[in-house]
């Protein structure tokens, strides 16, 4: 029996109001969007950016574009176990080579679905949003070039893993261009996502790759992939021994004010450590037929409380 209260994202009542739910895997996102327009399907989880305009004009179709923790955070994950990013000074140069507005424009995110200057590890629009440490995050190729000259970097190629035909590849190419302008030698290697996962498991043979994550995973130091796994056996192998005790203190904190204070302290250390560099915060909207009633506000599909009008 469901709880007798209104639903609230993953909490609250969970009443089932449909007889059957069919989950379909369609060959590509454009095919899925076309099927939604013709009424062959009722819901599309992620709408490709170049289909948003068409879906907004389609009769009987609504878009669900959310903010805050329901957005996505893009990151470039760095390999701390292998040169040149085993040197923290070299890693920190990248903070000056990422222009989030340009990245998001390049992958086609409409401005209404983008946060173009988010410097918070814990997402913008979240309870822990903070700018502590963010003075390092200032785009300037000239400043990056000067900083790189003062590091141990000796011209060795930086292997950049790229996912073929994806927004991740687009974001990576924008960074690769800026890195070359600053003096890095970049070796762009294109592959599928499965190969990226296999390659990143090794401590050598790669320098960085682009990825994006659901904001729900990134709004807390305890769940942020590249902070929560500090000093763990996790691809990228970033470690600052100051962070694990701070994570433990955050978990024990008695209230929000104390959690926020500790989160700010963790972010300051994380900016110095540079486990990853954010390339932007954005929404990938869902789309659904107007006949669906009761869809909850969520960046992933939740179908309790949903009913379908005839």
Residue ranges and their predicted role:
Residues 2-18, 55-70, 77-87, 123-143, ...:
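Short, solvent-exposed loop/beta-turn-alpha elements that line the ligand-binding surface or hinge
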Residues 3-54, 176, 185-187:
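Ligand-site clamp/hinge motif
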Residues 30-40, 58, 88-89, 173-182, ...:
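Short helices/loops that flank or line small-molecule/ion binding pockets
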Residues 47-58, 215-220:
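A ligand-binding cleft/hinge motif common to bilobed small-molecule-binding domains
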Residues 81, 85-126, 170-171, 270-278:
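Periplasmic-binding protein-like
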Residues 96, 113-150, 165-170:
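Structural transition elements
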Residues 150-167, 208-212, 254-290:
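Bilobed periplasmic-binding protein-like "clamshell/Venus-flytrap" ligand-binding domains
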Residues 177-229, 262-263:
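Periplasmic binding protein-like
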């Amino acid at each position: 029996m469901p709880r007798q209260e209104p639903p609230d994202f993953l909490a609250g009542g969970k009443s089932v109001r449909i007889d059957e739910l069919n989950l379909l895997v369609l060959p590509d996102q454009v095919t899925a969007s076309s099927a939604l327009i013709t009424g062959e399907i009722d819901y599309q989880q992620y709408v490709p950016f170049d289909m948003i305009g068409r879906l907004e004009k389609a009769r009987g179709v609504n878009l669900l574009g959310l903010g805050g923790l329901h957005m996505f955070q893009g990151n470039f994950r760095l390999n701390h176990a292998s040169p040149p990013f085993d040197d923290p000074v070299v890693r920190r140069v990248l903070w000056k080579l990422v222009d989030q507005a340009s990245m998001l424009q390049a992958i086609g995110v409409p401005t209404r679905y983008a946060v173009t200057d988010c410097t918070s590890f814990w997402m913008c629009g979240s309870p822990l949003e903070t700018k502590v440490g963010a003075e390092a995050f200032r785009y300037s190729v000239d400043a990056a070039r000067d900083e790189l000259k003062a590091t141990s970097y000796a011209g060795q190629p930086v292997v950049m893993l790229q996912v073929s035909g994806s927004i991740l590849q687009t974001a990576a190419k924008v960074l690769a261009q800026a890195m070359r302008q600053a003096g890095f030698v970049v070796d762009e290697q294109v592959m599928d996502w499965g190969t990226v996962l296999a390659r990143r498991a090794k401590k050598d043979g790669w320098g960085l790759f682009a990825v994006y994550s659901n904001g729900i995973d990134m709004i807390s130091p305890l769940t942020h992939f590249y902070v929560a796994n500090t000093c763990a056996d996790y691809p990228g192998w970033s470690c600052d021994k100051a962070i694990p005790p701070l994570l433990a203190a955050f978990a024990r904190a008695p209230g929000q004010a104390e959690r926020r204070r500790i989160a700010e302290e963790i972010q300051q250390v994380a900016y110095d450590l540079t486990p990853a560099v954010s390339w932007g915060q954005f929404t990938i909207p869902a789309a659904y037929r107007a006949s669906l009633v009761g869809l909850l506000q969520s960046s992933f599909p939740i179908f309790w409380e949903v009913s379908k009008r005839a």
